[in-house]
Design a protein with these regions (language model features):
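Short, solvent-exposed secondary-structure boundary/capping segments
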Residues: 257-268
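C-terminal motif of bacterial Sec signal peptides marking the signal peptidase cleavage site
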Residues: 15-18
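Extended amphipathic alpha-helical segments
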Residues: 24-27, 74-88, 93-95, 102, ...
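Sec-dependent signal peptide recognition
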Residues: 2-13
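Surface-exposed patches in structured soluble domains
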Residues: 31-32, 48-53, 57-60, 169-173, ...
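Surface-exposed connector loops and short turns at secondary-structure junctions
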Residues: 219-248, 272-296
Length: 298
């Protein structure tokens, strides 16, 4: 009888040891999050179109709204017309200096002719000096005219360059009137409706990349030695009522500082007051939702 009691006590101790062992299904818990983007207006104007609703899926570059472009279109036309005016005012240098160049050619010919006559004794020195003086006058006149025309042309070219910059600015402003989705994901919130007045910096809608979710979990100091960035882990999405689904996860971030354990989080060591946040990337198959609880097995 004594041997039987000893055997029963041994079995009971083994069962209790198994029940109190650290063989949990998870090592850390947390909630699923997604990268959220708030899209704001980059131009002022009335919303002529805003054809998305909360819950809609949009793709990167997809146009979702249009801000009134009337005034910018008119401004673009004005800038284009201004550039044409500047272009028409640019002088044709070759035509405007042609007359003076022709006079200079004749004056040099006269200078050469008088130089020959003086050499032969058929003309006096005064006539040659007058011819040389005329050449110098025309050379100065041509140089001054060329300088003036160059200055005028450069000024008009600069004004045309300014018009080109203005045209690019208007084109950029027009582009910003066409509001597009910056990422692929789901529309979470819509802050305005078609017909309302949008202002620069005023939020239009918020969306999230729900294809690439991450679980923000918390680990204890003791667990830091068994987790590292890039590590593959098992993630369990908790659907409630004991229903879970397993996903492959990858540790992408570990906080450099500790924090007090959030009240809604369970850790491997329930006595731990300080924990470290970690992010675990998970590919979403459509079942994981923002705010859903999840568990991690390291």
């Amino acid at each position: 009888m004594k041997k039987l009691n000893t055997w029963a006590a041994t079995v009971l101790c083994a069962v209790l040891a198994a029940c109190t062992g650290n063989d949990k299904e998870y090592d850390a818990t947390g909630t699923f999050e997604a990268t959220e983007v708030t899209v704001s207006a980059e131009q002022n104007g009335r919303l002529l179109a805003f054809d998305i609703n909360e819950g809609d899926r949009v793709t990167t570059g997809q146009q979702v709204a249009l801000i009134d472009t009337t005034q910018l279109y008119l401004k673009a036309r004005q800038v284009g017309a201004t550039k044409l005016v500047y272009a028409s005012q640019r002088p044709d240098q070759s035509k405007q200096i042609a007359a003076v160049q022709q006079q200079l050619i004749k004056a040099r010919q006269e200078q050469q002719r008088f130089a020959g006559l003086v050499k032969d004794g058929a003309a006096n020195r005064k006539m040659l000096e007058d011819a040389e003086s005329q050449v110098k006058v025309l050379e100065r006149q041509l140089a001054a005219l060329q300088s003036s025309l160059t200055t005028s042309t450069n000024s008009l070219n600069a004004q045309m360059g300014t018009a080109d910059v203005q045209r690019l600015q208007v084109a950029d402003e027009l582009r910003k009137c066409h509001v597009s989705a910056p990422i692929t994901g789901i529309v979470l919130d819509k802050y305005m409706e078609r017909g309302e007045f949008a202002a620069i910096g005023k939020p239009l809608f918020k969306m999230a990349d729900t294809d690439n979710m991450y679980l923000r979990a918390y680990v204890t100091t003791a667990q830091l030695k068994i987790i590292k960035i890039g590590q593959a882990v098992k993630v369990l999405a908790d659907y409630g009522n004991g229903e879970r689904k397993e996903y492959a996860g990858k540790v992408t971030w570990i906080s450099a500082k500790s924090e007090f354990t959030p009240k809604t989080i369970l850790t491997d060591d329930e006595r731990a007051d300080l924990v470290y946040a970690v992010k675990i990337a998970v590919k979403n198959d459509g079942y994981i939702k923002i705010g859903m609880y999840g568990e991690v097995k390291l």
